[in-house]
From Swiss-Prot:
Protein's name in the database: 16.9 kDa class I heat shock protein 1
Inducers of expression: By heat shock.
One GO biological process term: response to hydrogen peroxide
Cell compartments where the protein resides: Cytoplasm
CDD domains linked: ACD_ScHsp26_like
Keyword annotations: Cytoplasm, Stress response
Taxon lineage: Eukaryota, Viridiplantae, Streptophyta, Embryophyta, Tracheophyta
Biological source species: Oryza sativa subsp. japonica
One annotated Gene Ontology cellular component of this protein: cytoplasm
Subunit structure: Forms oligomeric structures.
UniProt cross-references to InterPro entries, sorted A to Z: A-crystallin/Hsp20_dom, HSP20-like_chaperone, Small_HSP
Amino acid sequence: MSLVRRSNVFDPFSLDLWDPFDSVFRSVVPATSDNDTAAFANARIDWKETPESHVFKADLPGVKKEEVKVEVEEGNVLVISGQRSKEKEDKNDKWHRVERSSGQFMRRFRLPENAKVDQVKAGLENGVLTVTVPKAEVKKPEVKAIEISG
């Protein structure tokens, strides 16, 4: 059993790692024409909470800021969406491998009550989208001392 296989024996660039579950997966899940978009459609996003804010980071290499939308809907749902277009193809081009994904993506996150949704900021730098949602200061309950008579 070989760990490396060729998609096309005549193409020296077609080496793939062998996947023992590949044939099982293909028999259960039918192939679609959107296989190249599957990875991008489920954009991975990190969400961390700091004492001051909620910070979301998404790796979006090759995506321009005009192709990304950051919105707050229903009062407290952060929506990050966008699209990476396919590269223009020339009929004379011969592709040896297509691994970069393209297509649309959308992710939704329900923000906690302490999120200041009117102060959300977003920036795209070096292919990383960073969305910062400031948190409202937690008011400590006021303690009122009661004098005890007697």
